[in-house]
Amino acid sequence: NITPASIRSMITRKTKAIVCVHLAGWPCEMDKIMELANEFDLFVIEDCAQAHGAKFKGKAVGSIGHIGCWSFCQDKIMTTGGEGGMVTTNDESLWRKIWAYKDHGKSYEAIYEREHPEGFRWLHETFGSNYRMTEMQAVIGRIQLKKMNEWHSKRLDNAYKIWSVAKGCKGLRVSEVPDYIEHAAYKCYVFVKPDELKESWSRDRIIKE
């Protein structure tokens, strides 16, 4: 994962936001990243595509930064029947911009909060694209959301069983997850220590045999 130090080294006068990726389900160090963002007046966008269910110090990922982005692609923790995604935020002004962008620049205020005379209504006030989810996809997603807690618990339990065994195997290395991190275990990484393997053995040979 990126670190506050690596982010700081990349910040310039042109920097507007920090995109932190909770890679493989392991949350970034959000406290220090948010402090850094406040120092430079930057937005923080959490990429939670691989981190459904993960938490940082008891807070769900996607709820710490200014915006959370989620993937529902077919190979992610949950899916909406192929492709899909979600954006979350507690900032209403950002939400209105996101809402408009996903529907060809259509204004939420113009549709729901403005009186119009009879006849044609011009509702598109900015640029945008089509990111509207179909109703069938939404149904699939809503059902899977109800199962997320159960899936998360089972996946994490399986991952820790694998890591527990791998820790006792010479030639293998397992990353230590801090107590304040709740991993989503989208990936269950176990690393090979090449210098501890016998001659002619490698990561690829282990996988093959």
What are these regions (language model features)?
Residues 82-83, 142:
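Amphipathic alpha-helical segments within well-ordered protein domains
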Residues 2-80, 86-94:
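Active-site phosphate-binding strand-loop segment of PLP-dependent enzymes
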Residues 64-66, 81-82, 133-135, 185:
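A structure-centric signal for secondary-structure junctions around beta-strands
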Residues 2-5, 9, 17-21, 26, ...:
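PLP-dependent aminotransferase class I/II
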